[in-house]
Design a protein with these regions (language model features):
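Short acidic-glycine-tyrosine-enriched beta hairpin
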Residues: 74-89
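A cytosolic small-molecule/anion-sensing beta-strand core signal
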Residues: 64-65, 80-81, 99
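A short, N-terminal "cap"/entry segment at the start of jelly-roll beta-barrel domains
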Residues: 1-36, 71
Length: 110
């Protein structure tokens, strides 16, 4: 990652920030954080689950690699590369990786 003098953040290869995802693990790396946004890159090993939970903030999930089963309240979807999901605050949701998954979480914190 590099930051210019104007405080722009440029990440040439976002997926490269999470590598070597060990079996039976979920890894995360904060890419960006300010008063209004938190960007976190997740890597899931196949079969790993982020159990049902809620967030106090609206959020966006952008799936970059792999396939996952995603539950959003009563709705279930099959996520694949390119899947983009907006979730309102307090929506129960969970993610189960079917394959190795890389996903960008954008939490809208203001």
């Amino acid at each position: 990652m590099s930051e210019s003098l104007t405080a722009n953040l440029i990440v040439p290869d976002l997926q490269a920030l999470v590598t070597d995802i060990a079996a039976e693990s979920i890894v995360s790396r904060t890419v960006y954080k300010d008063d209004g946004l938190r960007a976190i890159l997740f890597g899931f090993a196949p079969g790993e689950t982020l159990s049902e939970h809620t967030s106090s903030f609206p959020a966006i999930l952008h799936f970059l690699e792999g396939e996952a089963a995603v539950t959003l309240g009563a709705e279930s979807i099959a996520a694949q590369p390119g899947t983009w999901v907006h979730m309102p605050a307090h929506l129960p949701h969970s993610i189960e990786a079917q394959t190795t998954v890389k996903m960008l979480l954008l939490m809208l914190t203001s």
